[in-house]
Amino acid sequence: MMTEEHTDLEARIIKDIHCKEIDLVNRDPKNINEDIVKVDFEDVIAEPEGTYSFDGVWRVSYTTFTVSKYWCYRLLSTLLGVPLALLWGFLFACISFCHIWAVVPCIKSYLIEIQCISHIYSLCIRTFCNPLFAALGQVCSNIKVVLRREG
């Protein structure tokens, strides 16, 4: 019994990320399309007070808009969903590849080189600027400012 539980736990831990279960109810769990794509009839068509169409026309227009948007989206997603998913998967794979194999190594290389330069810069500052400003500080240390009120 204990061995079965351990094997089941290992199976869950080793589970491939490409086989994770997807939520078919909440298809936007991170709400990335909350304000952008959510367009209803009331967001597009509105009749101001005093210029109303017949109630039947309004109902049929609402139904036509809603049903046509629903089925047009379904048709487009059926025809283009998989090819576009393939395209976007390829694009983000290329971006990830470039980031992992080009951008990060370039940044690390730059940081290594700039660290060497920063040591040389720091040495120059300590060698030339620190004594200069210390001397200027000594020269200016005897300056006294006196404020008087006239009145």
Swiss-Prot record:
Record-listed cross-link Glycyl lysine isopeptide (Lys-Gly) (interchain with G-Cter in SUMO3), residues: 38
Transmembrane helix keyword on record: no
InterPro entries, A to Z: Caveolin, Caveolin_CS
Assigned keywords, A-Z: Cell membrane, Golgi apparatus, Isopeptide bond, Membrane, Ubl conjugation
Membrane topology: Peripheral membrane protein
GO cellular component: caveola; cell surface; dystrophin-associated glycoprotein complex; endoplasmic reticulum; Golgi membrane; intercalated disc; membrane; membrane raft
Residue ranges within the lipid bilayer that do not cross it: 84-104
Modification after translation (UniProt): Sumoylation with SUMO3 by PIAS4 may reduce agonist-induced internalization and desensitization of adrenergic receptor ABRD2.
GO annotation, biological process: actin filament organization; calcium ion transport; cardiac muscle cell development; cardiac muscle hypertrophy; caveola assembly; cell differentiation; cellular response to ionomycin; cholesterol homeostasis
Recorded GO MF terms: alpha-tubulin binding; calcium channel regulator activity; connexin binding; enzyme binding; molecular adaptor activity; nitric-oxide synthase binding; potassium channel inhibitor activity; protein-containing complex binding
Principal localisation: Golgi
Ranges per topology, Cytoplasmic: 1-83, 105-151
Tissues in which the protein is found: Expressed predominantly in muscle.
Compartment(s) of residence: Golgi apparatus membrane; Cell membrane; Membrane, Caveola; Cell membrane, Sarcolemma
Highest taxon, organism lineage: Eukaryota
Keyword Phosphoprotein: no
Assembly behavior: Homooligomer. Interacts with DYSF. Interacts with DLG1 and KCNA5; forms a ternary complex. Interacts with DAG1 (via its C-terminal); the interaction prevents binding of DAG1 with DMD. Interacts with TRIM72. Interacts with MUSK; may regulate MUSK signaling. Interacts with POPDC1. Interacts with CAVIN1, CAVIN2 and CAVIN4.
Function: May act as a scaffolding protein within caveolar membranes. Interacts directly with G-protein alpha subunits and can functionally regulate their activity. May also regulate voltage-gated potassium channels. Plays a role in the sarcolemma repair mechanism of both skeletal muscle and cardiomyocytes that permits rapid resealing of membranes disrupted by mechanical stress. Mediates the recruitment of CAVIN2 and CAVIN3 proteins to the caveolae.
Similarity comment: family membership: Belongs to the caveolin family.
Name listed for the protein in its UniProt record: Caveolin-3
Organism: Rattus norvegicus
